[in-house]
From Swiss-Prot:
Reactions it catalyzes: fluoride(in) = fluoride(out)
Residues that coordinate or bind Na(+): G71, T74
Organism: Listeria innocua serovar 6a (strain ATCC BAA-680 / CLIP 11262)
A GO-annotated cellular component: plasma membrane
MF-aspect GO terms: fluoride channel activity; metal ion binding
Family of this protein: Belongs to the fluoride channel Fluc/FEX (TC 1.A.43) family.
Biological function: Fluoride-specific ion channel. Important for reducing fluoride concentration in the cell, thus reducing its toxicity.
Transmembrane portions of the chain: 3-23, 32-52, 59-79, 90-110
Pfam families per UniProt: CRCB
Regulation: Na(+) is not transported, but it plays an essential structural role and its presence is essential for fluoride channel function.
Keyword Nucleus in record: no
Topology in the lipid bilayer: Multi-pass membrane protein
Protein name per the record: Fluoride-specific ion channel FluC 2
Keywords: Cell membrane, Ion channel, Ion transport, Membrane, Metal-binding, Sodium, Transmembrane, Transmembrane helix, Transport
Amino acid sequence: MYFLYVGIFGALGGMCRYAMNLWLGGGDFPSATLAVNLIGCFLLAFIMPFLAEKSRISLVLLNGIGTGFIGAFTTFSAFSVDTIELLQQGEVVLAISYILVSLIGGLVMVKFGRRFSNKLLRRGAHHVD
C-alpha cells in the first residue's frame, strides 16, 4: 500500500514541478528549480509534523505526501545539473549565488515551516483546554 500512495502522490508532485517549470522556467537562472526546492523545504517542515500531530491521516498517507508528493516536487538532481551548467557557461558568480541561496534559503524555509507548524499546534492545544 505504501508504494501505491508514494506512486500516486509522486505523480502529482512531479506534475506540479513540471507546471512550476513551465510557469517560471526559461532565462539564465534556474528559478523554477530554486522555487520548488524552497517551497518543498517549507512544506516538508510544516505539513508533516502538523498532519502527524493534528490529523487522523494514516502513516501510509503521510508517507505518500512526504516521500511521494514533496519528494517528487523537489529536485536535488536538477539543482546539481543547473549548477554545473552555470559553471560551464562561465557564470561562476551566478552558480555560487545559486548554491548559497538554495542551501541557506532551504534551511531558512525549514525553520519557518517548523515554527509555523509548532505555532499552529500550540494554538490548537490552547483551544482544546
